[in-house]
């Protein structure tokens, strides 16, 4: 039985599209459907392996809607997304049915962040960064149990070493 009461629908557009990452965090993979968020752009972040979105008025971001997220699961995901993101309610269109749906998603707090650039690609991430990201996510969960728990940001900073010349993470 799932803990928590309310059921939320959550639009994910980066690493949380990967079932293995979601399973590590929630101990299950919720039902999900493909969706498009209009009026936003998905950015790369210099020195990081995960993306973010910001409203731009014209763009489209492809992703998935995770269905039936509980209060406890949403709390876990809020903690994972950490202080860099705000959770907002947005409208997406489901790819298969064109149905419009109000969902939660995580939006980058700092719209003027100088580290924002380009377009983040999920398939490229899966090929190059997924394995290390899953390992770092497991480390985040381990660190949460410590008396002085580390945030996801702190865990990932210590897990990934950065090649500052090209902004790509290196294995630790």
From Swiss-Prot:
The keyword Transferase applies. Induction: Down-regulated by biological stimuli. It comes from the Eukaryota. GO terms for molecular function: acyltransferase activity. The keyword Transferase applies. Expressed in flowers, leaves, stems and roots. Its EC number is 2.3.2.-. Substrate binds at residues 13-18. It is an enzyme of class 2 (transferase). It holds the Pfam family GGACT. The active site is at 81 (proton acceptor). Keywords: Acyltransferase, Transferase. Belongs to the gamma-glutamylcyclotransferase family. PANTHER family: AIG2-LIKE PROTEIN C (PTHR31544:SF9), AIG2-LIKE PROTEIN D (PTHR31544). Putative gamma-glutamylcyclotransferase. This is AIG2-like protein C.
